[in-house]
Amino acid sequence: VSMPLVTTTEMFQKAYEGGYAIGAFNVNNMEIVQGITEAAKEVSSPLILQVSAGARKYAKHGYLMKLVEAAVEDTGLPIALHLDHGEDFAICKACIDGGFTSVMIDGSKHSFADNIALTRQVVEYAHQHGVVVEGELGRLAGIEDDVNVSAEDSSYTDPNQVEEFVRATGVDSLAIAIGTSHGAYKFK
């Protein structure tokens, strides 16, 4: 009997109490899943495997689930499976119904009010299924899954909106924009 996937809530609580960080890695094929989980096993580290929209399109949901199930069985590590940057309710629902233990709903391209409404909808569904939800407030510059957010269109998270957003949505965690960016960059 293999260990089940765990939620990020359980992981974060243990990490907070133990004073350590947990790596979150985007995966899209067997070699990446194996490399990450084998490295984590060497140091007995819990980890979060993240799946983007591009990875779901490339590798397909069923294949990714089997890879992650094999990783949990092979390593015996606490592993959470997280949807990275879900863009709408439908994608979040599909991942929740399909066995993910955590989803991110990225409503940051919407108005503050619409972001709250969308995030709240995902939270209500996810929490009924024991799934953790990460929201996003503010927009990171850069490129991720062919979504290009220019520096002009990026926005820092407004600290004055954070408390209201968390209270109104019920999110379990929050991604904020504080000057970080997505993508691979070549430095000269």
Named regions from a protein language model:
Residues V6-K14, N29-A55, H61-P78, G86-K188:
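Alpha/beta enzyme core
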Residues G19-A21:
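Terminal or standalone catalytic/regulatory effector modules within metabolic enzymes
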Residues V1-S2:
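Short, Lys/Arg-enriched N-terminal segments with co-localized hydrophobic residues
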